[in-house]
Amino acid sequence: MADEDVQALVVDNGSGMCKAGFARDDAPRAVFPSIVGRPKHPGIMVGMDQKDAYVGDEAQSKRGVLTLKYPIEHGIVTNWDDMEKIWHHTFYNELRVAPEEHPVLLTEAPLNPKANKERMTQIMFETFNVPAMYVNIQAVLSLYASGRTTGCVLDSGDGVSHTVPIYEGYALPHAINRLDLAGRDLTDNLMKVLTERGYSFTTTAEREIVRDIKEKLTYVALDFDQEMKTAAESSQLEKSYELPDGNVIVIGNERFRCPEVLFQPSFIGMESSGIHDCTFKTIMKCDVDIRKDLYGNIVLSGGTTMFPGIGERMTKELTALAPSTMKIKVVAPPERKYSVWIGGSILASLSTFQQMWISKAEYDESGPSIVHRKCF
């Protein structure tokens, strides 16, 4: 199977960003938006070779004349043609490798539909002719990256959030909570809040500007009501942001109202419980003997956990929910934006993992359903 000298590829396909690189590296080589853009208008420039589709950063930079689509929604692939374009772009343009020469480790959202997993496997073997592949759950990889095998991972990206309890390296599927509330919803909500202030953001291109505002200026308040009072009484919380056209907008309480949605989804009309509540419920669904280990190892991962103040707020909320004697530790590793990828890089380079790969021969013998037997 995988020879020691052939480097495996690790591809973490997120709803918002695709992270790709080589096993044994400590960071992904390529990080680009999971976007496919198509021209809104037919080309009129003679001699310009206009493509029918642009992927990633190129789509991002030409966003003014393109319609942008995300093929992965809520962590699950909804458009396979576009997804194939993203993988093609990953291998040939970003990493510049021939996929038929490298084993490929892919990641998936917990509770991913079975058919999706099979389709992923099929495309890898039949379209890209990879020699071997494996699919792993994102949250488990994040935990590996933090050097643990037991813990409760809150993984929140652009399209979906999950709380996943893991004991001795195994995810406990019955206790996984899935929350269709993540970075993209926060961006949409911030767009709406800014529109109320008289700044209009409507197009897919303008959404990217709002995402940038969100990433640069927002934070999680430790005490939301107190923070609202402070914001109303003075302007010390206000920050300004320069738009690409030179206009400057000022944002005040929007800075912490935006990520507050994670703790109070009712702000955007969702009936689900907040991330602190999901984490608590996940732990309560686990065996009473392992709860102590889970409470003591709550690991944050994904781009939407990058808000300043989220760790402290999480600790505060969980302390209020859990038994008073319980010691609660929320770990927010600095590299958590890429910890899924880093975990994949660690896993794919372990000598003990080499027999786990699904080989082309096994696939040819059993077909796509082999993925359920080998990857769990």
Swiss-Prot record:
E.C. code: 3.6.4.-
Protein name: Actin
Keywords: ATP-binding, Cytoplasm, Cytoskeleton, Hydrolase, Nucleotide-binding
UniProt-listed InterPro entries: Actin, Actin/actin-like_CS, Actin_CS, ATPase_NBD
Record-level Gene Ontology MF annotations: ATP binding; hydrolase activity
Family of this protein: Belongs to the actin family.
A Pfam family this chain is assigned to: Actin
Places the protein is found: Cytoplasm, Cytoskeleton
Catalytic reactions of this protein: ATP + H2O = ADP + phosphate + H(+)
Described function: Actins are highly conserved proteins that are involved in various types of cell motility and are ubiquitously expressed in all eukaryotic cells.
One Gene Ontology cellular component annotation held by this UniProt entry: cytoskeleton
Main location as per UniProt: cytoplasm
Keyword ATP-binding set for record: yes
PROSITE patterns noted in UniProt: ACTINS_1, ACTINS_2, ACTINS_ACT_LIKE
Transmembrane parts of this sequence: none
